[in-house]
Amino acid sequence: TQPDISALVEGHTDNMKVFNLGQIKDNWDLSVMRATQIVKLLLNSATIDAKRITASGRGEFFPLDPSNSDAAKKKNRRTEIILTPKLDELYQMLNEK
């Protein structure tokens, strides 16, 4: 456990529109649900403090590959985990050196 690090789990989608798949109304819903599933997996399988992890959705608005090919769409359907240190502690560490 790293008490000085938080995690942001971002869900992303491709640019194909989602049309009312039950709870999933659009790519925003899909991306949030994608991130939430990863957060639940992490919380169930690791000793992570739930207060230090956040799920968010980015929809189709941050593609890794903006082309419209099948390979690009596959690449854009993803989840990213971004680790963030406490900035005040990081700043202090940098100033000590």
List each model region and its residues.
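Short, cationic low-complexity segments
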Residues: 97
